[in-house]
Amino acid sequence: MYSVHIYTKYMTNSIDVVVAGAGPVGLLAAIELTLGGARVLVLERLASPSQAMKALSFGPLAGEALLRRGMRTAIDDAQQRSAQAMQAFTQQTGADLRVRASKFNGHFAGLSLIRRDAQVDPDRRPRHVDQPALEAMLAARAQALGIEVRREHEITGIEADDEGVEVSWMSPGGPGRIVAAYLIGCDGGRSTVRKMCDFAFPGTEPTLTFYQATADVDHPERLLPIGWNRTERGVFCYGPVPGRLFMLDFTGPPANRDAPVTREEIEEVLRRTSGQDVRVSALHAASRWADNTRLVDTYRQGRVFLAGDAAHVHSPFGGQGLSLGLLDAANLGWKLAAVIRGDMPESLLATYTAERRPVAEAVLANTRAQVAILRPDPQSGAMRDLIAKLMDFDDVNRYIGEMMTGVSMRYELVASAESHPDVGRLAGDWQLSDGTYLFDAMQDGRGVLLDGTADRRASQRVTTITHQVRCLPVAEGPSWLLRPDACIAWRSEPDCTDELAGLENALRRWFAV
């Protein structure tokens, strides 16, 4: 066992990690930590979950992270509700659902040309669950695990040193404070944690305004077809559920992002971007934001971490932001829990920034590119037409599809020449020989060995080193070691003299006791 640095300033402390923010990223981080044995407290500024319609879906890798934590049925139920809402939309507007179905594979800058038949693994596809539904299912899972979430608790102070982090707050019951070993800021793009702890947040200034709203619109059929519609005045989208509006206004960034979004403002922007004589008769929810694009230099400062929008902000094209944040939580949670348990040295935590920051850099780059070809000027339109033609080529279509879903992501765990090409990739939800699925065996937060050796020698090697890996026999062939986040940490080489070469090194690097 590695010795854990005990934070002695307040010996009455009973919390290992404070998570700031009870949105999807904060809740998943708390779930991961709790499964790993950490004691967690979640502090949330809002009195209740936001019902604003933000993301309508999340990517395949984020969906798989939820499957690994026991939410298969909840996801299926939520997707069924989404399908029913889309059906209601078609009945309301007369839109062709078959057209919408062709767009389920995602898009690049509104170009819904990503083809499932061009993808290497077409079954790894986005999950059509909106953000309020996602947050509800994560909250239910957190409650089932006994995680305490304190709402209307606004963080007012953070003091961190080598022994721990003291977090102060204001709530309806008055001020309070607690000391924990670590703090994770999952509190959004305007993160209090990031600002109070002086994380550098370089990037580019906003140039335009996005609007998203749920509203009643007279003559909604005038806003068809379904999907992204680029005009000389901007971009608009109506659907794919009743009342959902999305507009992109290139006249500049919002003068005051904090000002309430009014019915009149939504109507004016919708009329201008669409060029249609439509009226917004009622506004139920609305938000505006800009395309400021920023990324922290590091995801960790001492005992304070950032995840999700607290660490990176960008334009929302392709629905990548929510998935990016959920995978931050999935990457950090099990590692931090292992350090708190004493199973791993603190040096493991350095891999969080090393693995996740390059992924965010890539997302920031592709969202900037999408903004560039959505602008209404002729030069941007010409580039957009060229990209659309290039997507007719299978290799280009596959590249863009994998970029947008993230399935091509690979962490550099070891030098590429020293390992199998699959090492560093996230495994899919493979069906096992007994008919069960891999992720159903990972719900306890441990790693997994898929042992394809004839005499189960790989399993024997594992059990002598760690109890944090579940061994599953599979048909004779390759063996695989998966971290708790389903990252492939090792794969056997069939033509290697020692087919278990590297297994022990991988076990000690990621699971050592």
Model-derived features: positions:
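Glycine-rich FAD pyrophosphate-binding loop
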Residues: 34-54
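Core beta-strand elements of the Rossmann-like FAD/NAD(P) dinucleotide-binding domain
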Residues: 13-15, 173-182
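A conserved short coil-to-beta-strand element within the FAD-binding core of flavoproteins
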Residues: 151-165
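Conserved mid-domain beta->alpha element of the FAD-binding
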Residues: 21-30, 66, 138, 185, ...
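Active-site-adjacent segment of FAD-dependent monooxygenases/related oxidoreductases
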Residues: 54, 58-137, 141, 241
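C-terminal helical "tail/cap" subdomain of flavin- and related membrane-associated enzymes
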Residues: 2-11, 335-447, 452-464, 477-478, ...
